[in-house]
């Protein structure tokens, strides 16, 4: 929560979006509303969403989502940690690799658990692939238009990431 809260995110109405230590808060409510909107869009387009027990549909509209049930129904595409693997064996570890194709870590969490002790990528290189490094700076002009595609069943990353970038 501390990292997300530091970004000073606001919704379209200017309301601050934050999280409490327990994961609840206005940002969690915002993410919930995005999932509901995505499911509502699918329903309106004729998709059968009845298999999702996490959704509540009343009078032809998606009215609620049980986020704990959603996490169980639409399971992860990759195991934890999804990107920076402990053994530095992921494609993302290669992306941060050396010119000699030696993979490197980009999180202290995975680096500390690596049985082979692969090196960490330099902070400057890690920052290049973190959109928040740039878009949160005052001297950066963010593109006025960009496309983020993420829907109800996307599992490559959590919706909070593209939603935060969009804000």
Please give the residue ranges for each predicted region.
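Acidic catalytic loop of the alpha/beta-hydrolase fold
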Residues: 153-157
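Mobile, glycine-rich extracellular loop/lid and propeptide segments
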Residues: 160-162
